[in-house]
């Protein structure tokens, strides 16, 4: 008979040993996994009427996890993509458990067999050049926060950094002179360097002359000298989008996020004829195939432009099957 295994020590060792020591996971990954398990434990507490510290491993089984994921999507309204990210964190923990408590392999395999939910992948959303220009002009550069926000937006749209990467930048991560660039630790603890345009270099040089706030050396700190929070960044973007929409009305109905600015940079590179492999390196993608979404967006733009043109006249020579079965297959 399989003995009971307490969940608490196993989950603690997963975070402390597997994620932090062995994998050296980024703070962003750790916080994402932490949030997943906080939500899962609260759900299990309501469902099983037991405090998290008293839960046994075998109680976190496949049916409970599926119910948890369904609850996130249906009751809390998270997207399918977010649901799948939660499942990825749970799968990672159960793969770790497979080595630590192999006697529970049957339960572990059932959890690992829970598939990600399929969803329709939408085309990427990005800003046009007039929209970007209006957004960059929005901050009031007569104030400290306005100068910070202008520099932040310029770096975001010119480098395509992720939210966690740009808020984690330190002043020491900037390198000027010939080949001016910034250094960033991205996904998977991989370091990459991203070059600056001359205009960005000038703005950042001036920004570094500002009195430093806080003692952490953060490049874009909050007013208290701390790292900008996710909500703080989104508040900043919403404020400047609202101001910029007076100059560029098309911004009125758009949601501006750091991720959308990242998409904007990628589209600029692609439309300038930059190879997809270079774009993948620039953005820190593990695979060139990830940049396919930008190519698909470009094709969609071309198709929309084609639809507005006057088509040349000509007779269609498309084959018309006279067989009912072939007609059925062609209709699928």
UniProtKB/Swiss-Prot annotation:
<feature type="domain" description="Tyr recombinase">
    <location>
        <begin position="122"/>
        <end position="307"/>
    </location>
</feature>
<feature type="active site">
    <location>
        <position position="259"/>
    </location>
</feature>
<dbReference type="Pfam" id="PF02899">
    <property type="entry name" value="Phage_int_SAM_1"/>
</dbReference>
<feature type="active site">
    <location>
        <position position="262"/>
    </location>
</feature>
<feature type="active site">
    <location>
        <position position="162"/>
    </location>
</feature>
<dbReference type="InterPro" id="IPR013762">
    <property type="entry name" value="Integrase-like_cat_sf"/>
</dbReference>
<dbReference type="InterPro" id="IPR002104">
    <property type="entry name" value="Integrase_catalytic"/>
</dbReference>
<dbReference type="InterPro" id="IPR004107">
    <property type="entry name" value="Integrase_SAM-like_N"/>
</dbReference>
<feature type="active site">
    <location>
        <position position="285"/>
    </location>
</feature>
<dbReference type="GO" id="GO:0015074">
    <property type="term" value="P:DNA integration"/>
</dbReference>
<feature type="active site" description="O-(3'-phospho-DNA)-tyrosine intermediate">
    <location>
        <position position="294"/>
    </location>
</feature>
<dbReference type="Pfam" id="PF00589">
    <property type="entry name" value="Phage_integrase"/>
</dbReference>
<dbReference type="GO" id="GO:0044826">
    <property type="term" value="P:viral genome integration into host DNA"/>
</dbReference>
<dbReference type="InterPro" id="IPR050090">
    <property type="entry name" value="Tyrosine_recombinase_XerCD"/>
</dbReference>
<keyword id="KW-1160">Virus entry into host cell</keyword>
<dbReference type="InterPro" id="IPR010998">
    <property type="entry name" value="Integrase_recombinase_N"/>
</dbReference>
<dbReference type="GO" id="GO:0003677">
    <property type="term" value="F:DNA binding"/>
</dbReference>
<dbReference type="GO" id="GO:0046718">
    <property type="term" value="P:symbiont entry into host cell"/>
</dbReference>
<keyword id="KW-0233">DNA recombination</keyword>
<comment type="similarity">
    <text>Belongs to the 'phage' integrase family.</text>
</comment>
<dbReference type="GO" id="GO:0006310">
    <property type="term" value="P:DNA recombination"/>
</dbReference>
<feature type="domain" description="Core-binding (CB)">
    <location>
        <begin position="5"/>
        <end position="98"/>
    </location>
</feature>
<keyword id="KW-0238">DNA-binding</keyword>
<keyword id="KW-0614">Plasmid</keyword>
<keyword id="KW-1179">Viral genome integration</keyword>
<dbReference type="GO" id="GO:0075713">
    <property type="term" value="P:establishment of integrated proviral latency"/>
</dbReference>
<feature type="active site">
    <location>
        <position position="187"/>
    </location>
</feature>
<dbReference type="InterPro" id="IPR011010">
    <property type="entry name" value="DNA_brk_join_enz"/>
</dbReference>
<dbReference type="InterPro" id="IPR044068">
    <property type="entry name" value="CB"/>
</dbReference>
<protein>
    <recommendedName>
        <fullName>Putative integrase/recombinase y4rC</fullName>
    </recommendedName>
</protein>
<keyword id="KW-0229">DNA integration</keyword>
<keyword id="KW-0814">Transposable element</keyword>
